């Protein structure tokens, strides 16, 4: 499943909408997403699953590139 993650790059900063970044990640669950991103110390605001028509829209209208976490 593909997830869209809204995050701030620094855990210590107060979230500001204008500084929010997005990445797309393939994972089995929201918990799996958070586990994979844990080592980056991001301030994760929201994790959203992207499926069906929403996934097609993101592919056509957004810069949908799956992040590879090693």
From Swiss-Prot:
A non-essential component of RNA polymerase (RNAP). This is DNA-directed RNA polymerase subunit epsilon. It comes from Bacillus cereus (strain ATCC 14579 / DSM 31 / CCUG 7414 / JCM 2152 / NBRC 15305 / NCIMB 9373 / NCTC 2599 / NRRL B-3711). NCBIfam families: PRK13667.1 (NF010188). The gene is rpoY. GO terms for biological process: DNA-templated transcription. It is an enzyme of class 2 (transferase). Belongs to the RNA polymerase subunit epsilon family. GO terms for cellular component: DNA-directed RNA polymerase complex.
């Amino acid at each position: 499943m593909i997830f869209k993650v809204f995050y701030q790059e620094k855990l210590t900063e107060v979230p500001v909408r204008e500084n929010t970044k997005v990445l797309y990640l393939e994972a089995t669950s929201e918990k799996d997403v958070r586990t994979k991103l844990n080592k980056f110390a991001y301030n994760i605001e929201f994790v959203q699953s992207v499926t069906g028509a929403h996934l097609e829209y993101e592919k056509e209208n957004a810069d949908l590139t799956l992040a590879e976490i090693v």
